[in-house]
């Protein structure tokens, strides 16, 4: 078969890289479940109507067609067609509505699954990738304290990954109500448009954002400057945040008795609570950063972006926020708050920038040698004895020369080679020699019994190193 060409944006990890990815997945799952989150998996496809509900553009959605239907897709409206999910929030909202009678609320769920997004591939950005999400969904209402809990859970999970070379992570938080109230206080009406342009600040810079605010959102130059001044505000505690925000409102004539300020103050109070409570539990893990906008229009409260120290070019590696209107059933709403890690992007950084790597490809600690094919059943019995005792074991694929079998083990990183007992050559009725096992790293070879032998725990363990 001819060698297939790679497809841009669809990564395939080598076995050693997959070990790193799996370790990241296992670590995240452990932390999520430690905090009471329940794992689910949803289907890969949703209706076009569901996918477009989140504000995503149709050009970013991969639609499905049977081969014989190619060329006739226009006969079916996009809302009725099936597409691959581009995130895990849309599937979650549909899942909650469909299964609400079987779920306990608030519903705390974790989900680690592939998603597909039709965007231009570039370094660290893929068209097929794994996301890791946590969300809490309420029935009717959802207490604000979850807006503190979720970013702290994510920080805890990312902190665990520092053992594999990940730098320290800091969550930058804002609140949509704060931003919206300020923009309305300035006299701006296209709040969603302003948020979308502010969300581009790190990518295109302040001058270009100011131009877009005036050209596409109807802002005057003074209003655009005020929006950028708000985006410059950061604070590490609630009192500092309130003082800076009130001073900015006063300088732009936003009265404290106005409806706009009242709305902004609601968001400010929630954001101050998040920063202060996070500081009491994990100092420095969450800061207020008023340029965080999250361009998707379904967020209604807190919004988050997460950055790694010394990795500015990577951008945000974990984002999310509060959404009150994404899922509903009749008159009943299911508000939620969630955060999502681009896991494939994170793994790519850990592999190529942080130097994370597996100490060996194979999970097996032992390779049982095979002297000849007639002895394979005996080799398999030894392997099964070791496996029954929890020792990961493989058997040599062929009865090749011993040197080739050892080279095979070395290529896979298997540290021990087991030599089954063999009858001494020559003398009739000679007693079989005993089993022996060799550490091919140190060269040490000792007599061994598969019912009692124990490998060195450090040597036997498949690990991720930096």
Curated annotation (Swiss-Prot):
Gene3D superfamilies recorded: Anticodon-binding domain, Bira Bifunctional Protein, Domain 2
Disulfide bridge map: none
Annotated Pfam families: HGTP_anticodon, tRNA-synt_His
Catalytic activity line of the entry: tRNA(His) + L-histidine + ATP = L-histidyl-tRNA(His) + AMP + diphosphate + H(+)
SUPFAM superfamilies, per the entry: Class II aaRS ABD-related, Class II aaRS and biotin synthetases
Compartments (UniProt record): Cytoplasm
InterPro entries: aa-tRNA-synth_II, aa-tRNA-synth_II/BPL/LPL, Anticodon-bd, Anticodon-bd_dom_sf, His-tRNA-ligase, HisRS-like_core, HisRS/HisZ
Protein name: Histidine--tRNA ligase
Species this protein is from: Bifidobacterium longum subsp. infantis (strain ATCC 15697 / DSM 20088 / JCM 1222 / NCTC 11817 / S12)
